[in-house]
Amino acid sequence: MRAQSKDFNDVITQIKEGGNKIGMTTLSKEALQLASMFSFNMSDDIKSLLDGMTVLKITKNKTGTTATFFDNSVKAFDEAGYTSIDVSSYVDRNTVRVFGKRRWLSIREAHIITTTDRGTNISIFGKFKIRTIRRVLKNNDLRKLF
């Protein structure tokens, strides 16, 4: 994020101090509100998958930004027919392809995607747009995470 990098860094600091979780118990109301505005410049297919998920943590390092989603993210990928995520199939540094039963899906701006038993990680190179994760947080009861 260019314009709000200071605010973003403040959020990251609070996340780290709060045990790397975004939630009512670990972030101030202002930081939670700011974090809820982050979204990714991705295809509509992926946005629709992400809309039903709860953001568990956001971390930032030299190579990009990683958002970790709650367990139901894995279920959402399964239901959409994306049975495996091939993190080695870079088209370029801004595109990763998710392999599904039906087709390859290109995810713009994604650097790497991994699924674990704790959730789905999406690492982002560069661009952030302030838009849609607001819906993700609003549609989920964050208290169920704690």
Predicted regions and their residues:
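Early exported N-terminus immediately downstream of N-terminal targeting peptides
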Residues: 7-73
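Surface-exposed flexible segments
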Residues: 65-80, 124-125, 135-138
